[in-house]
Amino acid sequence: MHFEPYPFEKLTQLLEGITPNPAYSPIALTIGEPQFETPAFIQKSLSKHSEELRRYPKTAGETYLNDSMRGFVERRFGVKLQPNELISSFGTREVLFNFPQYYLFDKKEPIMAYTNPFYQIYEGSAIASRAKVIHLNLTEQNGFKPIINEAELAECDLVILNF
């Protein structure tokens, strides 16, 4: 199994040994780590409730958190989710890599579709899942909206849409 290096790793290698022009401020093309301090009210609340962090969280997530997230999705996107249609996690990478492997495990020749450009973890999960990939190209011509025809959709075992 061969996984491609992340684009940020490739960029780091490309930039090795290059001295930037001191007349310009470089643009940080990082992995999206926060570049600001945690707001004081969050620090205060975390400190106040830190004793509660001594156990692992529930696998299914806390009911109040799931209710809040489902409410957000309904308000923002007009989609009413059922409690079993939501996964709570500390980050997306692990879920997006592992879920397709779990879901496609018993498929003989799995097929998954996802948008292109894509979050590279989708490619890794497709490789690990032995899945054929249908790229849903986002272009100016299609208004940067994923388009999949009925025939492609019928053969897909999993479609990942992100926005």
Language-model features: locations:
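Conserved core of the PLP fold type I
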Residues: L53-F163
